[in-house]
Swiss-Prot record:
InterPro entries: Pneumo_NS1
Name assigned to this protein: Non-structural protein 1
Intracellular or extracellular location(s): Host cytoplasm; Host mitochondrion; Host nucleus
Subunit relationships: Monomer. Homomultimer. Heteromultimer with NS2. Interacts with the matrix protein M. Interacts with host ELOC and CUL2; this interaction allows NS1 to form an active E3 ligase with ELOC and CUL2. Interacts with host IRF3; this interaction leads to the disrupted association of IRF3 with CREBBP and thus reduced binding of IRF3 to the IFN-beta promoter. Interacts with host MAVS; this interaction prevents MAVS binding to RIGI and inhibits signaling pathway leading to interferon production.
Described function: Plays a major role in antagonizing the type I IFN-mediated antiviral response by degrading or inhibiting multiple cellular factors required for either IFN induction or response pathways. Acts cooperatively with NS2 to repress activation and nuclear translocation of host IFN-regulatory factor IRF3. Also disrupts the association of IRF3 with CREBBP. Interacts with host mitochondrial-associated membrane (MAM) MAVS and prevents the interaction with RIGI. Interacts with TRIM25 to suppress TRIM25-mediated RIGI ubiquitination and thereby RIGI-MAVS interaction.
């Protein structure tokens, strides 16, 4: 099987509704199943919201493989709790240019998002986040 190795995937996040909203998400996790990790990422749901000037980002997946909240690292981003009652802001619908090279995944992965919440849904989501984070 081989031992677990530290793997890093860098993903370019682009909001298809606003091309200026681009950020790099660096996912660092211990796994020896890089292909499964890539597929997990492609099927995951990304939560992101700006609350009181802070952008919260979290990848939600039911897979046993990373990513989980404790391995997400990105400049200008922080992780947030998973909402137990569901709901999302962006759904990851496409993951391209990710492949293995000498046991590593190419770091020029590109991600495209769709599914924007309405203002009322966003307000409700923001309220839930405020409660979870103790900001109310």
């Amino acid at each position: 099987m081989g031992s677990e190795t530290l793997s890093v995937i860098q993903v370019r996040l682009q909001n298809i509704y606003d091309n200026d909203k681009v950020a790099l998400l660096k996912i660092t996790c211990n796994t020896n199943r890089l292909i499964l990790l890539t597929h997990t990422l492609a099927k995951s749901v990304i939560h992101t919201i700006k609350l009181n000037g802070t952008v919260f980002l979290h990848i939600v997946t039911s897979s046993d493989f990373c990513p989980t909240s404790d391995i997400i690292e990105s400049a200008n981003f922080t992780t947030m709790p998973v909402l137990q009652n569901g709901g999302y802001i962006w759904e990851l619908i496409e993951l391209t240019h990710c492949f293995q090279t000498n046991g590593l995944i190419d770091d020029n992965c590109e991600v495209t998002f769709s599914k924007r919440l309405s203002d009322s849904e966003l307000e409700k989501y923001s309220s839930q986040l405020s409660d979870l984070l103790g900001l109310n």
